[in-house]
From Swiss-Prot:
<dbReference type="InterPro" id="IPR009403">
    <property type="entry name" value="UPF0637"/>
</dbReference>
<protein>
    <recommendedName>
        <fullName>UPF0637 protein BH2637</fullName>
    </recommendedName>
</protein>
<comment type="similarity">
    <text>Belongs to the UPF0637 family.</text>
</comment>
<dbReference type="Pfam" id="PF06335">
    <property type="entry name" value="DUF1054"/>
</dbReference>
<dbReference type="InterPro" id="IPR053707">
    <property type="entry name" value="UPF0637_domain_sf"/>
</dbReference>
Amino acid sequence: MSIPGFVQADFDVFTIDGLEPRMEKIKNQIRPKLEAFGTELAPTLSSLTGDEMFVHTAKHARRTVNPPNDTWAAFANSKRGYKKLPHFQVGLWESHLFVWFAIIYESPVKGAFAEELLKAPTAIRENIPDSFKWSVDHTKPDTVSESELSDDAFTKMVERLRDVKKAELLCGITLDRKDPLVQDGDKLLHTIEDTFKTLVPLYQLAQQSTVQM
């Protein structure tokens, strides 16, 4: 059975004014698609990582005034939550779709993971394609390409993850909203799966950091 991709109207949801009107569209229009991808991707990630992975679709429950500027499905090895754990994300901003491996500010393994990255940065980055992106804040759409990231900038980014309480680190791909791939659900699914395969070593390194704590 084919899986539906994302159309321009899905990205336009993030231009709707007001919390309730935007949330209604997210719930009824975007979330079912993310859940469909989640159903397909969770078993794949479980196989790739060796951990049973569970899907967590963003509920944006803490929001009372400002509408969300993005939404996502996250994958982690816990039914209870994902924010404190190394995890994967698939989601949308108004401008693009993203596929991430993520360590966000709530994770207690940030420091240990950063130390592991600093031990062998060249070996780690050799497995990251030049087209992949890095982000230091999951709440902002800004990214930097692997091809544009100097050794010094990478080191500073990782040291910041270790030293700054609110620091984060995400790695993966972004696809422009007008990229034909975004609308083709089946091809998009394969692209996400391939991206996750590339990112699994980062996940395993983070899990190794968890064990060492």
